Regions:
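An alpha-helical support segment within catalytic cores of ATP-dependent transferases
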Residues: 27-36, 149-206, 217, 263
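Generic structural marker for isolated residues within well-ordered, non-membrane alpha-helices
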Residues: 35, 141, 258
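Active-site Asp-x-Gly
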Residues: 216-269, 293, 299-302, 307
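A conserved alpha-helical element in kinase catalytic cores
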Residues: 32, 65-115, 119, 123-144, ...
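A glycine-centered beta->alpha junction motif in the catalytic cores
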Residues: 64, 76, 94-95, 110-130, ...
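Conserved NTP-binding catalytic cores of kinases and kinase-like/nucleotidyltransferase enzymes
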Residues: 1-101, 217-221, 302, 306-312
């Protein structure tokens, strides 16, 4: 692989659509110059991008001393996403297989840029049974959960309020692609989780624990990438696992997954279930907006099926 750096920058449709949805046209136009500046300042070679990136421009890179790395350039958007990710990596990152999150070599908050260790295959690429994936997701997420009161990260209550606003606005913008009952259920669950937030119990959570965000570590084990970063109840991360695999969720009793996750991690099943309800609608709408199908439609179909159902 040549990593001398692209004269032209290839951006996937998913990343391009997400950038356009965020109003980041100037960022897209400026990517070649941004990459050239980082190559010079960090003394790195930059190769082709990864095809499966969704939240940022992510490319293969190599340091001056030959170490394999990854260059990640965050899409500019409201909410300080780059600063939050950098904060999580500074708090929870490090060397060795016991670290649950990717190691960060360099960062530039102003440019939304990070130079990260290059990891192996994603959990999705390994083709493991869903039960094995859930065990690995839980075990990896647990290694991140810790007190981080002075991190400056948003709280679970703030995220719950943001999700409610996002659901309301995006549902209307897209012409109501799921039922009003599903949206009402998600908004009710979001309000419950906002009311339940407790600063004293809140821990650092990843915020997007799914099978594409867990990769094989170079020294064994698994590591998370792409943290959103919140100070929230740990159940939030398990709510993401509830959100994922929507087709498989409906093949049995959907409540069983929430109960298993709660028992596995010693947490509250109702909180896990409610975060899953909120995230399923929010993410289904987002994926529909950026054209990532069929999973967007599958999430919304699952949300319609589960509308009004509380954990019993």
């Amino acid at each position: 692989m040549s990593e001398s750096g692209p004269a032209q920058v290839s951006v996937s449709d998913v990343v391009r659509n997400k950038a356009l949805a965020a109003g980041a046209e100037r960022w897209l136009d400026g990517l070649p110059g941004l990459i050239a500046g980082l190559k010079r300042d960090w003394r790195i070679a930059v190769g082709p991008p990864f095809d499966d990136a969704t939240e940022a421009y992510v490319a293969r890179a190599r340091t001056e001393d030959g170490r394999a790395a990854v260059l990640k350039l965050m899409i500019p958007r409201p909410g300080d996403a780059a600063q939050h990710e950098i904060a999580v990596l500074r708090i929870a990152g490090g060397e060795g297989p016991d670290q649950g999150i990717v190691r960060m070599f360099r960062y530039d908050s102003d440019r939304g840029a990070m130079l990260l260790e290059r990891l192996g295959r994603s959990l999705d690429q390994l083709g493991l049974p869903i039960g094995s994936r859930h065990e690995i997701l839980c075990a990896t997420a647990e290694r991140i959960w810790r007190p981080a009161a002075r991190s400056g990260l948003p709280t679970g209550a703030e995220k719950g309020r943001w999700l409610a606003r996002h659901i309301t606005a995006t549902w209307a913008e897209l012409g109501r692609p799921c039922s009003a009952r599903a949206v009402e259920h998600a908004l009710t669950c979001a309000a419950r989780r906002v009311a339940a937030h407790d600063d004293a119990r809140a821990v650092l959570v990843h915020g997007d624990v799914h099978q594409w965000n867990v990769l094989e570590g170079r020294d064994g084990g698994y590591k998370l990438i792409d943290p959103d970063g919140l100070l929230a109840e740990a159940e939030y991360d398990l709510g993401i696992i509830m959100r994922e695999d929507p087709v498989e969720l409906l093949t049995g009793d959907p409540c069983d997954r929430a109960r298993w996750l709660a028992e596995r991690c010693g947490l509250d099943a109702t909180a896990i279930w409610e975060w899953g309800i909120v995230e399923r609608v929010s993410t289904g709408l987002l994926l529909t907006k950026i054209g990532l199908q069929p999973v967007g439609a599958q999430m919304l179909a699952a949300a319609d099926h589960l509308a009004g159902l509380d954990l019993t």
